[in-house]
Amino acid sequence: MTSEIHCDSLWYGADIVTMRDGKYHTLSNGAIATRDGKIVWLGEYDALPATLTADERVKFDGGIITPGFIDCHTHLVFGGNRSAEFEQRLNGVSYAEIAAQGGGIISTVKATRDADEERLLEQALFRLRPLLAEGVTCVEIKSGYGLTPESEMKMLRVARRLGELLPVEVKTTCLAAHALPPEYANRADDYIDLVCNTIIPQAAAAGLADAVDAFCEHLAFSPAQVARVFAAAEAAGLPVKLHAEQLSALGGSELAAQHHALSADHLEYATEQDARAMGDAGTVAVLLPGAYYLLRETQCPPVDLFRKHNVAMAIASDANPGTSPALSLRLMINMACTLFRLTPEEALAGVTTHAAKALGLQASHGTLETGKVADFIHWPLSRPAELAYWLGGQLPCTVIFRGEIRQ
């Protein structure tokens, strides 16, 4: 005997792109039954169980349904912006010259430290809303522009508040090992002491961080210093991720794999050894085409090696004031295809299935399957490849967040 299924809402009248296993796996004329914010039944409409009852039925007029988008790498909370420096760079002023004038990341650190929480919140809301308009239902937000215990906690509190004020799930990452603050010039190990002994334990104790990140690069922190950060994160019970191999090959992504990091991000200079280690560890490669584009880089991430070694590839906006002031995940999907040669199917998996894995959420998010969170998007499109094809326009018809239409 078939048991009765009762749901709050039955959504039907569109093709459902489930993204199970990172593939389209489209259900023609599909239906999704949701209850208490979860998917309780999914399949073709003609296969609806006779025992299924719904409090409401919502019929779409064609189109496609995809999982909600996940932006798994952002720096949305910061003070000010660096549009003046953008103009300077276009006029031939080097990054080193800008930094010598007090610009670069240190200018953002100053603006972030000077801003109170309400001002940071106001600015972050302005940046987050365009992502939500495109169907983002889950977003990761990093700290990393405070670089003191007080300012890092301030950033993380603002990130948490964003998830309370807007209908979006926010995952927070403590990125205190992002840059060397000016007061620690030539004392990087001392600053790492502060990160490991004070900032990470405070963030964990306050419940403000879901993960810990670091920037492993010649202009930031060495693999040995990052290893200390990872040890502190693990002691605090937090998973790790890493900015790695963006500008040079330092072995950061292999280090991340050794620590079973959720993800290693950027990866333009990753090697086959890195890709093999990441594949073995299940570490996701998060590709950030916005930074690649704005910095006019010429070395692409080794996508073929990631495919060869079964490394899941996610895509994110890397929204930040310096190298990727990008507030469109749809544009990142197109850039990943045109610049990095991902297929449209891989790119869609990059903002759904694999983005969920990059945040440790693969059991609950990223695909449309029974038991998972009811976050999905209805698009006025006929094929999922159109999500990578169109530049601008074509916003969602409807975004469903936890089983309810997001207003």
Swiss-Prot record:
SUPFAM superfamilies: Composite domain of metallo-dependent hydrolases (SSF51338), Metallo-dependent hydrolases (SSF51556)
Transmembrane regions: none
Pathway: Amino-acid degradation; L-histidine degradation into L-glutamate; N-formimidoyl-L-glutamate from L-histidine: step 3/3
Enzyme Commission number(s) of this protein: 3.5.2.7
GO cellular component entries: cytoplasm
Major localization class: cytoplasm
Cofactor(s) needed: Zn(2+); Fe(3+)
Positions with a binding annotation for 4-imidazolone-5-propanoate: 82, 145, 178, 246, 323
Job of this protein: Catalyzes the hydrolytic cleavage of the carbon-nitrogen bond in imidazolone-5-propanoate to yield N-formimidoyl-L-glutamate. It is the third step in the universal histidine degradation pathway.
Protein name: Imidazolonepropionase
Organism whose genome encodes this protein: Serratia proteamaculans (strain 568)
